[in-house]
Amino acid sequence: MGKTVVRSNESLDDALRRFKRSVSKAGTIQEYRKREFYEKPSVKRKLKSEAARKRKKF
């Protein structure tokens, strides 16, 4: 999880923006959404092969 310390003379909006950026760079939100629901191993393999096929197409 991202950690942000509010600097002196920094608005809360700026600190929140820095926090959101750090969380985004760390991939926390994407990881949460990926693990929100259980995926069977067969479904994971299917999605992985579809993603590879899509990458190869372009």
From Swiss-Prot:
Entry keyword set: Ribonucleoprotein, Ribosomal protein
Protein name: Small ribosomal subunit protein bS21
One GO term (biological process): translation
Family annotation (Gene3D superfamilies): Ribosomal protein S8 (1.20.5.1150)
Family that this chain belongs to: Belongs to the bacterial ribosomal protein bS21 family.
InterPro entries: Ribosomal_bS21 (IPR001911), Ribosomal_bS21_CS (IPR018278), Ribosomal_bS21_sf (IPR038380)
Keyword Cell inner membrane among record annotations: no
Organism for this UniProt entry: Latilactobacillus sakei subsp. sakei (strain 23K) (Lactobacillus sakei subsp. sakei)
Pfam families xref list: Ribosomal_S21
Gene Ontology cellular component annotations, sorted alphabetically: ribonucleoprotein complex; ribosome
GO molecular function list: structural constituent of ribosome
Extent of the signal sequence: none
